[in-house]
Amino acid sequence: MKSLVSSLLGACALSALSLAAQAETNLTIATVNNGDMVRMQKLTEDFTKANPDIKLTWVTLEENVLRQKVTTDIATKGGQFDVLTIGTYEVPIWGKKGWLVPLTNVDDVDDLLPAIRSGLTVDGKLYAAPFYGESSMVMYRKDLMDKAGLKMPDAPTWDFIKQAADKMTDKANEVYGICLRGKAGWGENMAFLTATSNSFGARWFDEKWGAQFNSPEWKKTLDFYVGMMKADGPPGASSNGFNENLALFNAGKCGMWIDATVAASFVTGKESKVADKVGFALAPDNGLGKRGNWLWAWSLAVPAGSAHAAEAQKFVSWATSKHYGEIVAAKEGWANVPPGTRTSLYKNPEYLKAAAFAPMTLASINAADPVHPTVKPVPYVGVQFVAIPEFAGIATDVGQQFSAALAGSMTVDEALAKAQAITDTAMKKAGYVK
């Protein structure tokens, strides 16, 4: 009898253990190695305490690698991830294809900034929740600008930027007037160069989807960029993306850096050697009615292939909530709350007091117009990207040519001719051009 009771007790214990194991859900989250995302991983105890049945596994990758892995996984229905970190390029395309789960429980959805929310919505359904939103702007060293005898306007021209870069450059002391993206990738150098080209009057395609890299506007864009970077940029610039330029700026090696508005809290944070010397301005223009700034939101989405969609939605709702912002504020200060997603943040006096960059961030986001991104008419939407599935592949190939031109291994004219050929071939193959 004793052994029967023992056996029954043992069986019950095993059954309880297996039930507990079944009850525990493991969410695999793919994310980018940017500062705000890395910070989130350290703050998830708030979520796991409230949801003890959910475990989180993080896959943190460099931007280009993340895009490749996530795209491959979702296109092949691999089911490797439960939460994806994707942006305003992927969401409308993947939402339309039925690859993402529509989100139904995002915290205070009407508080999301309209420009950001519309970029993540397909046919009235929200397919991703913004973790942080961004445009791009000029971050500059006020002390070096003073030393150069110049005053940065709130809305500078590219001519002023070139003049300031020339005067701020002091190569003997490893100070470079301008730091810009050079690393090849559709979301790296091509994000910057596409947005910049808009301000030079260029466009990717004419209204019949004909590639435009043989236009004088693209020639002006690339000549200006390569010329300025060779004169005033850091060595090895063709390998530098967002994170590399952030490290250079924080080390005091850049006079100006034109990049994501989200960098503002890092260049003024405790990791920065020049935190108290940084000013902000709108991305430059050429007087043609378009500035060189983009619009983007790193966002969290749930792939249709996830076996844990309900739990994944719970996590997405937590990470993009006002409550999460309050956790960051309590632990790291208001200036470090993920920016660019919620109207309420830009009305919060504590945030506005702590984040000197807030008004310029909001002005930059509001200045971007993804529906009318260019001076001449175009058949596409998107400021620093073209919202068609083929764009990522084409722009990555084009980005390699432009990175090579910056490195000096080919001329600007050769890079533009190759870009034209690559784009022509791909668009004909995809059936856009007959």
Task: Describe the role of every protein-language-model region.
Residues 42-115, 119-121, 127, 147-149, ...:
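Extracytoplasmic "Venus flytrap"/periplasmic binding protein-like
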Residues 164-167, 208-239, 279-284:
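Glycine-centered hinge/linker elements that transmit conformational signals in sensory
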Residues 127-131, 136, 162-211, 254:
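Extracytoplasmic/periplasmic solute-binding protein
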Residues 101-115, 182-185, 200-220, 269-273, ...:
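Short, solvent-exposed loop/beta-turn-alpha elements that line the ligand-binding surface or hinge
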Residues 24-34, 54-59, 82-83, 127, ...:
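Short, well-ordered beta-strand elements
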Residues 92, 262-274, 287-397, 434:
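C-terminal lobe and pocket-closing loops
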Residues 87-136, 159-162, 176-177, 189-192, ...:
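Hinge/lid segment of periplasmic solute-binding proteins
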Residues 50, 146, 370-434:
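Conserved C-terminal helix/tail region of periplasmic/extracytoplasmic solute-binding proteins
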